[in-house]
Amino acid sequence: MLYVIADLHLSTAEGMNKSMEIFGRRWSGYMEKLKKNWSAVVEPEDGVVIPGDISWALSLPEARDDLHFIDSLPGRKFMSKGNHDFWWSTASKMKQLFEAENIQTINLLNNNAPLFENFVLCGTRGWYQDEHCDNMPSGVDFEKLVAREAIRLRLSLDEGRALLKENPDKEMLAFFHFPPIWNGLRCEPLIEILHEYDIKRCYFGHIHGNYAAPTSFIDNGIRYSLISADFLNFSPRPILPEYS
């Protein structure tokens, strides 16, 4: 079984005080809830995609405890980067740390397309839908960042498409941290690529707190699903072979 959950926002290291509990009651005891709920549904042979905002650490060494926490949970994990993952490093450095720390169940979803059971896993971080978004950092080149994410998305989808030729019975899924569509705003360059590669399901995180918002919607034949941890009650959501 494949599962997905974004925005773990872990802060397990001693002296790291970046708990999400200040953001409301739903986050109260969230790391304990995550461990309990994850362990209740995920088996060791399952896979879990984690599309970003994984740890509050500011460097790869600082993220060590959070990575060990994830590694201790059941299942094989596929992690991609979020906007708060300042600890994220190069793939080679991260793999070196995994080997040095005997972290055995974490894989990267980063310019690649892992194959898991019925699915080819693709995606990228994404970016804000519009350069006028209220929360977008100042002084950044919106078009340059979107173009960079488009390149990374194509790298992943090209590898996925090659895998589909060898495994035509599989479905290619897209995972983002940022929503390509949200609250009337659209990141058209990335949406166009999803259509070009015939993606039917796209999962995203990043959104918090607006619990009245729809967590799943269809736009031009693609189903978009919000899978931030607080929307899932900190329990990984299953992805079934049929569309859901």
Predicted regions and their residues:
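Residues at the C-termini of beta-strands that transition into short coil/loop
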Residues: 6, 81, 112, 125, ...
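Core catalytic region of metal-dependent phosphoesterases/phosphodiesterases
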Residues: 16-116, 186-197, 221-222, 226-228
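Active-site glycine-centered loops adjacent to acidic/histidine catalytic or metal-binding residues
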Residues: 7, 52-53, 82-83, 177, ...
